[in-house]
Amino acid sequence: GGFVKFESRLERDFITIMALRRGVRVIDAQPIKIGYFDEDFRLRSYTPDFHIVRRVYHNNIPTHLESIFVEVKFTSELNGPKSPDLIGKFKHAQRWAKRRGWRFAVYSEDEIRTPELHRAEQLMPFRRNPENTKLETAIASLLRTGGPKLIQNVQQELGNFPSNLVFSEVLRMLANRQIASDPMSLVTENSLVSMWQDF
């Protein structure tokens, strides 16, 4: 994916998580303006921070695409003096999304700044690494035939390749969502990796 603009570090962290989350196809910033009437019947408008389109899986089989409109806010803002105004906006956004078969969600630092973010930050730099096609094929076929394995076992079984090269190729494949590991844990040589269907 390309660059998605963000207005705060929390928004940047949200994008980082979504970029590595399984099934996320689209991350759009400030996608649409929603018009609504407030309780004084004044026309107001509200622009969600992001539109996410993700593929939903059931028993590892992709079933449908889901659209989610997202607001990213610190808890202090959600509970601050603007809280009543925000709640009003969010209610209208929720109704607006529901009528169209979509979802609206609010993410705070509690949902964003988690171990999933630390893993995503670890993997992000590997996304743009050039692939080592020979090694990628060897790793994928090893996991396809042998099931989930610790990265150190993958390194041992592919002993004809330097182990640091195997490790960085595994990181690149994880960063590009070609293979899976625990989304809440940093990746080490003791991490279990697998094809998505075995995850």
Language-model segment annotations:
Residues 1-199:
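Electrostatic, structured charged patches in enzyme active sites and in nucleic-acid/phosphate-binding
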